[in-house]
Amino acid sequence: DATKLDSSDKLPQLFKEQDICLLHLGSGNHKFIKGINKLYHTFEPIQERTEWAYKKSLLNEYNDSESNILSVANNQRILHDFVFGRDLEFENLPIQKRPKTYFPHRTKTTLRYSFENEQIIALNQQIEIDLTLEFNAVVAIFEAKNGTLKDFNIYQIYHPFLYYYSSNLPLQNIICCYLLRNENSLKFFAY
């Protein structure tokens, strides 16, 4: 399944040797691309480390799904702190003025974009969004993975970005975030 190639480590050895990978075109169609680094982004070193006062809850470690990683980080208010800053100022605000959380979902849409001077039209492209936060017309989309990855396939956050960017909603900014969980640590990347 080509959609499971979310890290270049998962590419077949022949692909690595030939420096090729797959670009999703939607409806089960793909295009071979020369240059793995064109579709996979290497994670940057973490520049700022924050110790968080973890408050264990009953279900926090009951399962290790990607959705649960996001739920734990959300319930601990880590996601809001990472994207919008400490949310103590929201304590007295009515709910409609507080940051909103939208949990994992899939949707289909047609995406149009340029890649290497070629117009790509991905018809009926399925997009999976692990989590979305929204506050004051700023949207943050999240992809989450368990384990240590060296890189990720850009489409995992670019397709959701393009979905919201093309929406004609009055958005001020779209932040693409990647969250990695490795045992007791969380690493956040924003693009």
Regions found by a protein language model. Give the residues of each.
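N-terminal, charge-rich interaction modules
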Residues: 42-106
